[in-house]
Design a protein with these regions (language model features):
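Alpha/beta enzyme core
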Residues: 1-187
Length: 187
């Protein structure tokens, strides 16, 4: 695949959408498809049942716990998770279920840093923190967040170094103005 040719020695985990697989068989098929085009592993928001099927098929899987944006309407909205004892235990159990299912890593999103420190000490999974502070094994941010690519509200865990959204809005206004001038010229 072209991406592998461009970066032959780079570890790549491809993200597979939550709703892309409706069965364990589809989860395995999607994992193999990602690997056939260059993935070393896949990142997913799947249930432990789907993670287990893919892991048993030899596909390295990174699960997702804490705030899962795609599931946020089911879990109380886009907000920090794990601030109460019940939520902290829920996050821990989610991570342990992914571990038992055979995942090698978990993306843990928007939980208290101290909770992630404690969980990281109690799991064999590689913990990847986004909005969980330095409590994980890895800390990352999305370029679209640090560059302000989308309209507010912005994630609180990410500083916006640029406002690309504003620039895109200005470009669109210029585009519309340019077409209006063109239309006036050809009338």
């Amino acid at each position: 695949a072209a991406i592998r040719q461009a970066a032959p020695n780079t570890f790549m985990a491809f993200s597979v959408p939550l709703i892309a697989a409706a069965s364990e068989k589809e989860a395995v098929r999607l994992g193999y498809k990602a690997m056939s085009i260059g993935a070393d592993a896949i990142m997913c928001q799947w249930s432990p049942r789907f993670v287990k099927a893919a892991a048993e098929a030899g596909i390295p899987i990174q699960g997702h716990a804490g705030l899962v944006p795609r599931k946020s309407t089911w879990t109380g909205g886009l907000r920090a998770v794990g601030k109460t004892l019940d939520e902290a235990l829920w996050v821990y159990k989610e991570i342990k279920a992914l571990e038992a299912a055979g995942a090698y890593a978990v993306e843990v999103e928007v939980i208290p840093e101290q909770l992630l420190i404690e969980i990281s000490q109690r799991t064999s999974l590689l913990t990847s923190s986004i909005g969980g502070g330095g409590g994980g094994d890895i800390q990352f941010l999305f370029a679209e967040d640090i560059l302000g690519n989308n309209p507010p509200p912005y994630p609180r865990h990410s500083k916006q170094y640029k406002n690309l959204y504003k620039m895109k809005q200005e470009m669109q206004a210029e585009r519309v103005a340019g077409f209006k001038e063109f239309i006036d010229d050809v009338k």
